[in-house]
Amino acid sequence: MWTWKADRPVAVIVIIHGASEYHGRYKWLIEMWRSSGYHVVMGDLPGQGTTTRARGHIRSFQEYIDEVDAWIDKARTFDLPVFLLGHSMGGLVAIEWVKQQRNPRITGIILSSPCLGLQIKVNKALDLASKGLNVIAPSLKVDSGLSIDMATRNEDVIEADQNDSLYVRKVSVRWYRELLKTIESAMVPTEAFLKVPLLVMQAGDDKLVDKTMVIKWFNGVASHNKAYREWEGLYHEIFNEPEREDVFKAARAFTDQYI
């Protein structure tokens, strides 16, 4: 993990990246938070980015949750309000992390286009085959079926990703089955967010995540303080879109009110 320190810190934000990516794709967002007075804590999830494990493969989704737990422990050492921002699969990790805590001890949570359902549907035969392969060949990798231009309209980001050797393009059968299992778990109603301020920020033209499932989850989650905002016309990676400064302002307005 890494820490980017603000000159006059008022809070700490822990950022959890999504599938296939890593911390290097968040340079703009990290600097926006840092220059706004937030220490930023972030790392690469297991099997992604600069981690030494097999890229695109995990044994269990719990590996992600355990890793993020260490990041949050680091954030707490600053004795400042701690916020959690999870994007896409990182949002799913954030949800499951909160559910596992008796007392989350975080000031607020932002979910950016959280992965609570997939737009791209795997055909039934391949899905059935993956169940068997998950037992006999869990590390077998297949093409993710995702293209970079499905995630953002930002041409600069698209060009950078096309030449990025750390961008994961193949995932294991085990990774796929663990993702589906965790999505199913996350959709079970929970009171874990009852006392945690929650902001869900969803791309209006999301080509990766099924936003109807995000709305369903949001409507079903018990919380004394929750808000949903949808960004019309924006693709999945709202913090990379041409309108990202407006998106960031909305995220910061949410966190600032709890400092």
UniProtKB/Swiss-Prot annotation:
Gene3D superfamilies: alpha/beta hydrolase (3.40.50.1820). Keywords: Antibiotic biosynthesis, Hydrolase, Serine esterase. The keyword Endoplasmic reticulum does not apply. One of its GO terms (molecular function) is lipase activity. It comes from the Bacteria. The active site is at S88, D206, H236. GO terms for cellular component: membrane. Its EC number is 3.1.1.-. Belongs to the AB hydrolase superfamily. Phospholipase involved in the biosynthesis of the antibiotic bacilysocin. It probably catalyzes the hydrolysis of the 2-sn-acyl moiety of phosphatidylglycerol to produce bacilysocin (lysophosphatidylglycerol). Is also able to catalyze the hydrolysis reaction of one acyl bond in phosphatidylcholine in vitro (actual cleavage point is unknown), resulting in lysophosphatidylcholine. This is Phospholipase YtpA. It comes from Bacillus subtilis (strain 168). The gene is ytpA.
